[in-house]
C-alpha cells in the first residue's frame, strides 16, 4: 500500500515537472513579449509577434516578426534586458534523478536531496536577423572546469586546434584563419591556452609546423618546448627577440621571391604544407611606447616594425602571428598589428577599457572564472570554456619530438614536388 502511494507521488511529481517544463516554453514567449513592451520595443500600432519556436540541443529558438519602424539594432541595444528578464532563481530538477529513487529506502529523504541539489538555470541570449528576429535562448550551462583530454584532438583536422566548450557544444579554431590577438590578466588562462596551442600543433602537425617562441616574461612558460625539433627559436629578451624577428623577415623575403618566380599568389596555391607560427608574449615588453632608454627603445621599434610586416603580409606566405598581452592598453597594442589579426581570444581583463582595446567593446572584464574566454572572429562572438592541460600531459605528448643536441643552421630551398606537383620545403643542414 505504501509502495503504491509512493509510486503515485513520484509519478505525479514527474508529470507535474513535465507540465512545468512545457509551460515554461510558453512563459518564455510571454516574458519576451512583456520585456519588449516594457523596454519600448513597440510602436503605437504594433508589437513583436511570435512566428515559430523550435527546440534545439542547446535550448530554444524563438522567431518573431518585428513591427515596421523598429530595427534589429533596437533589439541589440536591449539584449541585456531580455537576458536578465528571462533568468530567475527557479531551480531545475532533472527528471532522470527522480527515476533513480529507491522506494525500499527513505524515499522522502531522497526527494529532499534531489530538490536541494537542483541547479539554478542561467540562460544566455543571442540575437540574429534574417528578415525575422531570431531570439536564441541558450540553456546548456558552460562547465566551470574543463580538463584536457587527448581524445579531443581526434575531432580536429589539418590545422585545427581544440578551443573548448561553448553553450552550443565543442568548438575548435582553425589556424588557417590567420593571425590571433590573445589577451588575459595573470592566472586567468592565457598561458595555459598558449601551451595547449603549441602542444596541439606539435602533436598534430609534427612534420609541417615551425615555431618561433618569444617569451619576454622570463621564458619559463615555453621552457619545456625549447628542445622540440619543431621549435626554431626561443627568445627571452629584446635582443634575441629582434634577432628572431629579423630571421623571420628574411625568410619571408625569400618566400615572396620564390612565389613571384613560380607565379603563386599565396601559400595554398603554391601547395606548400609548412606553416610557421610566431608567438609573442608579452607585447608590452616589445612596445617602444613602454620601453625606456634610447637603445632599447630603438630595438623595440624595430621589433614592432617586423611584427607589423608579419601581420600585414605573413598570412599569405604561411606565417601565423599570435600576439599576446596581459596589459592591453592603446600604448601596448600596436594598431596596425591588431587590425591584421582577424581572431581575438581574450580571458578576463582588469577593466572595460582594456576590453575595448582588445575587443572594441566591453565584456572581458565580466568573465567570471579562469579558463572562461571570449572568442571573436569575423563570423561572430562566442563565450567558451577552454581546456586546462597539465604539464605532465604536455610532456607526454611532445616527448617523441624532443632532441637533446644543438640545432644546426639550416638553409631553405623551395622546389616543385615530383609526385603530385605540389611545392615543398627542402631543408639542408649546413
Language-model features, listed with the residues they occupy:
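Conserved alpha-helical scaffold flanking the Walker A/P-loop in AAA+ ATPase domains
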Residues: 264-270
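Conserved C-terminal "switch" segment of AAA+ ATPases
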Residues: 362-379
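N-terminal "pre-motor" subdomain/linker immediately upstream of P-loop NTPase catalytic cores
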Residues: 19-154, 328
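Short gly/pro/ser/thr-enriched loop/turn and capping motifs at secondary-structure boundaries
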Residues: 351-355
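Active-site phosphate-binding and catalytic loops of NTP-dependent enzymes
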Residues: 91-95, 255-264
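P-loop NTPase catalytic phosphate-binding loop
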Residues: 1-24, 58-63, 67, 141-261, ...
Amino acid at each position: 500500500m505504501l509502495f503504491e502511494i509512493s509510486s503515485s507521488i513520484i509519478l505525479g511529481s514527474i508529470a507535474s515537472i513535465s507540465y512545468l517544463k512545457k509551460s515554461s516554453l510558453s512563459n518564455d514567449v510571454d516574458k519576451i513579449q512583456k520585456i519588449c513592451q516594457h523596454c519600448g520595443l513597440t510602436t503605437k500600432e504594433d508589437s513583436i509577434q511570435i512566428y515559430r519556436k523550435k527546440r534545439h540541443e542547446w535550448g530554444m529558438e524563438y522567431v518573431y516578426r518585428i513591427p515596421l519602424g523598429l530595427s534589429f539594432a533596437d533589439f541589440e541595444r536591449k539584449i541585456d534586458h531580455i537576458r536578465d528578464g528571462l533568468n530567475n532563481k527557479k531551480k531545475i530538477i532533472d527528471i532522470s534523478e527522480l527515476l533513480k529513487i529507491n522506494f525500499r529506502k527513505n524515499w522522502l529523504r531522497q526527494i529532499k536531496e534531489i530538490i536541494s541539489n537542483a541547479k539554478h538555470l542561467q540562460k544566455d541570449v543571442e540575437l540574429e536577423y534574417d528578415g525575422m528576429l531570431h531570439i536564441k535562448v541558450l540553456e546548456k550551462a558552460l562547465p566551470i572546469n574543463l580538463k584536457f583530454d587527448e581524445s579531443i584532438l581526434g575531432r580536429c583536422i589539418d590545422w585545427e586546434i581544440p578551443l573548448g566548450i561553448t553553450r552550443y557544444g565543442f568548438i575548435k579554431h582553425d589556424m588557417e584563419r590567420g593571425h590571433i590577438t590573445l589577451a588575459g590578466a595573470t592566472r586567468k588562462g592565457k598561458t595555459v591556452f598558449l601551451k595547449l596551442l603549441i602542444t596541439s600543433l606539435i602533436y598534430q602537425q609534427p612534420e609541417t609546423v615551425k615555431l618561433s617562441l618569444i617569451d619576454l616574461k622570463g621564458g619559463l612558460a615555453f621552457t619545456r618546448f625549447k628542445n622540440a625539433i619543431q621549435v626554431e627559436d626561443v627568445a627571452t629578451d629584446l635582443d634575441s627577440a629582434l634577432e628572431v624577428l629579423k630571421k623571420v623577415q628574411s625568410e619571408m623575403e625569400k618566400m615572396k621571391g620564390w612565389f613571384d618566380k613560380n607565379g603563386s599568389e599565396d601559400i595554398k596555391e603554391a601547395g606548400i604544407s609548412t606553416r610557421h607560427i610566431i608567438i609573442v608574449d608579452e607585447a608590452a615588453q616589445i612596445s617602444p611606447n613602454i620601453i625606456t632608454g634610447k637603445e632599447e627603445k630603438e630595438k623595440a621599434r624595430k621589433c614592432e616594425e617586423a611584427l607589423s610586416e608579419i601581420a600585414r603580409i605573413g598570412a599569405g606566405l604561411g606565417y601565423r602571428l599570435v600576439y599576446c598581452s596581459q596589459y592591453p592598453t592603446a600604448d601596448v597594442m600596436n594598431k596596425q598589428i591588431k587590425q591584421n589579426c582577424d581572431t581575438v581570444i581574450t580571458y578576463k581583463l582588469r577593466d572595460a577599457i582594456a576590453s575595448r582595446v582588445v575587443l572594441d567593446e566591453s565584456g572581458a572584464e565580466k568573465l567570471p572564472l579562469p579558463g572562461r574566454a571570449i572568442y571573436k572572429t569575423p563570423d561572430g562572438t562566442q563565450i567558451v570554456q577552454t581546456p586546462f592541460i597539465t604539464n605532465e600531459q604536455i610532456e607526454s605528448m611532445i616527448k617523441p619530438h624532443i632532441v637533446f643536441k644543438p640545432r644546426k643552421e639550416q638553409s631553405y630551398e623551395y622546389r616543385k614536388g615530383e609526385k603530385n606537383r605540389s611545392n615543398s620545403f627542402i631543408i639542408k643542414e649546413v
